[in-house]
């Protein structure tokens, strides 16, 4: 599961009011095969910290089974940042699919 999958799953759970799913998704750290990412807090600015980057949710909205996510990505290896907006759909089973990305 990529960091963005994790974020959209979190937002989908929050938007649908599924408290159990939120508790399951949010933990002190999430172990991946090659690295550890941290999920910091359940507040509006969800931050994910990787070994050489940081991503922070700036804004998000849920409407008509669509999740709109605006986030900022800081890449420490290339020393740059970019703002990205992603649009995702949530089907009745809770599966989230990416529709479009703007950067």
Where are these regions (language model features)?
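C-terminal and inter-domain tail/linker signature
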Residues: 1-103
